[in-house]
């Protein structure tokens, strides 16, 4: 870890600053979004054990999973029900704070709930925000920006689900639709923002701010582990499986986890077989200089949140030394596991959120990986496997039933 951290270009202090900023905004969020009132305006998700799913996976794949299987329910985060509620909302808040501080309307010691007043709404309405997204990032940034008072435009790729676009429009967000994939939506969003000095473009491919918003999850998870009496150390390793699209969400979370747990946490990125952009970029060493389409892969997947053909060069280069591995899985496998999780645990997720669920059996089946790290049978028995569920809490019933029908 000591070797890898300098390459990120961000530090523990940067993550602490992000923590502090979210704490300053907590009184505002608690009033602006009723669903965050119970947690005092802190946007955090549950950590739950899923023993019935663990048994089901063992049965379906005839592969024992040593240790305990947990689920991190970012799928049910308040405000926008996805991991993007971490980074997306954080970057909008950071931008709003910067503008208000520069205008002399706010000091760091103020009660930030004053941002709900009409004068602030008026102030923020002079500014706009733009972002390119396959869905969830747009949802998070759109809902948050509109609530603060920004004019906001979300550039949506062809993969974006109709209900996500409809939800954004219901919040007064402008949605621009493209027939092409994620890369085009981001590029067009960037271009549109350049012509307007008052427009701030949130760059999912390169944003350090988004990355820091996600990284706060590390310390938060450490606190949840402590509350539940779970130990992470050399004898009790932690394996975390993160679905990966362009890389900002999983990259930021993995960075935060490394700061929180050091070398005792092992992070894996999971991608659809048709959109393995990060695996390709890291494996070839070309990062954002290569796309899956360059090698004849179509970037078409039911995992809309992961339908990215070209990875973030920033995340790939920053995180390559801090990750333990990558794997891919088919859409059908995601649908199957989506159904099993609903049956066994009563938890409903969108397809992309299941990408991490294939990880534990891959690690438990890979003797070469275990030997490379010198894991003993004892350590493997004491392992915690954490699947990061990235989205799905807002999926409409009708859409969810279609997903469930596709599982085997």
From Swiss-Prot:
What the entry lists under PROSITE patterns is as follows:
DEHYDRATASE_SER_THR
**Which domain of life does this protein belong to?**
Bacteria
Q: What is its EC number?
A: 4.3.1.18
Q: Which UniProt keywords apply?
A: Lyase, Pyridoxal phosphate
Q: List N6-(pyridoxal phosphate)lysine occurrences by residue.
A: 84
| Assembly description | Monomer.
Record-given protein name: D-serine dehydratase
Organism, as annotated: Shigella boydii serotype 4 (strain Sb227)
